[in-house]
């Protein structure tokens, strides 16, 4: 069995995980100080993930090991599980089923979990929610499960859109939710957004939040909440300055309390009335 040992964790190497899948990885597993990346054959890897080591190991059922070690993610009122974990959702919790290894947003990263928790703290009944950078659609689907009447997930990566639509169907979400390729601030994409939203959530990196802060304000009705994550704590000043520049109020910060030393942050704010 061919294994590539990459130093770090899913949290610290989050930005590089898609590169491994694109290079032909057949599975990823966090174990000790490394991410174990399984391949069928040795392949040339991008420079960003070239600091690991190749190993030949005795054959084992890594898929069985992966399934055994994967745990449900409890995010407020929502529990995110893999398809084989449906029976592990506690009574009273909303189940959100995501296949691990799909587009970004399986729920196992701290930023996704914090965003789902923040959505669960809002009354979304009858609300319109916009998810920017939707990836697998996990945040849009969480909003729909939590009662949103209309949810739109947008992403500039066309590969993610059919994946998000499939995930929604697999979760029984067939109306009131849609996914479209596009982004904020482009004239050709303006029509897809419609009227201002009651909630906007975005799991992107800090520099994009800085760039898009004005568009966030334009897409929200006055007084509506904004939820931003994907932010390294070291980048919080950049995001705070952007929100202040665009007139957002009630800016609050929370950091990840589980693993990774609290290096990830979530910021909530409200559009100025």
Curated annotation (Swiss-Prot):
Sorted alphabetically, the Gene Ontology cellular component annotations on this record are: cytoplasm
Q: Which InterPro entries match?
A: Ribosomal_L11_MeTrfase_PrmA, Ribosomal_PrmA_MeTrfase, SAM-dependent_MTases_sf
Q: What does this protein do?
A: Methylates ribosomal protein L11.
Q: Any idea what this protein is called?
A: Ribosomal protein L11 methyltransferase
Natural source organism: Deinococcus radiodurans (strain ATCC 13939 / DSM 20539 / JCM 16871 / CCUG 27074 / LMG 4051 / NBRC 15346 / NCIMB 9279 / VKM B-1422 / R1)
Which one of the record's GO molecular function terms can you name?
A: protein-lysine N-methyltransferase activity
For this protein, the record's Gene3D superfamilies field holds: 1.20.5.1350, Sun protein, domain 3 (3.30.70.1170), Vaccinia Virus protein VP39 (3.40.50.150)
One of its GO biological process terms is: methylation
Q: Where in the cell is it found?
A: Cytoplasm
Residues noted as binding S-adenosyl-L-methionine in the record, renumbered to the chain: 112, 133, 155, 203
Which key words tag this protein in UniProt? Cytoplasm, Methyltransferase, S-adenosyl-L-methionine, Transferase
The UniProt entry, under PANTHER family, shows:
ELECTRON TRANSFER FLAVOPROTEIN BETA SUBUNIT LYSINE METHYLTRANSFERASE (PTHR43648:SF1)
What family is it from? Belongs to the methyltransferase superfamily. PrmA family.
This entry's Enzyme Commission designation comes to 2.1.1.-
- What S-S linkages are listed for this chain? none
Residue spans crossing the bilayer? none
Reaction equations catalysed: L-lysyl-[protein] + 3 S-adenosyl-L-methionine = N(6),N(6),N(6)-trimethyl-L-lysyl-[protein] + 3 S-adenosyl-L-homocysteine + 3 H(+)
For this protein's source organism, the top of the classification is: Bacteria, Thermotogati, Deinococcota, Deinococci, Deinococcales
- Catalytic class of the enzyme: transferase
């Amino acid at each position: 069995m061919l294994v590539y040992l990459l130093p770090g964790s899913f949290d610290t190497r989050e930005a590089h995980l898609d590169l491994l899948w694109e290079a032909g990885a057949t599975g990823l597993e966090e174990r000790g100080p490394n991410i174990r990346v399984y391949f069928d054959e040795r392949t040339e890897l991008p420079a960003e993930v070239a600091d690991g080591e190749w190993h030949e190991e005795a054959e084992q059922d890594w898929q069985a090991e992966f399934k055994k070690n994967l745990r449900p993610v409890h995010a407020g009122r929502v529990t995110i599980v893999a398809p084989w974990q449906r029976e592990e959702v506690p009574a009273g919790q909303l189940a959100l089923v995501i296949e691990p290894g799909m587009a970004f947003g399986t729920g196992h990263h701290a930023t996704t979990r914090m965003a789902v928790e923040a959505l669960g703290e809002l009354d979304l009944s009858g609300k319109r929610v916009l998810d920017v950078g939707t990836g697998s659609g996990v945040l849009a689907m969480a909003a729909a499960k939590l009662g949103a009447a209309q949810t739109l997930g947008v992403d500039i990566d066309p590969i993610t859109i059919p994946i998000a639509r499939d995930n929604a169907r697999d979760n029984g979400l067939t109306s009131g939710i849609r996914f479209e390729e596009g982004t904020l601030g482009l004239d050709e994409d303006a029509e897809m957004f419609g009227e201002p939203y009651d909630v906007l959530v975005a799991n992107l990196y800090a520099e994009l939040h800085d760039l898009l802060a004005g568009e966030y304000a334009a897409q929200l009705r006055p007084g509506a909440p904004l939820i931003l994550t994907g932010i390294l704590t070291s980048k919080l000043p950049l995001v705070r300055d952007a929100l202040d520049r665009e007139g957002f109020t009630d800016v609050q910060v929370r950091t990840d309390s589980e693993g990774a030393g609290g290096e990830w942050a979530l910021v909530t704010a409200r559009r100025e009335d």
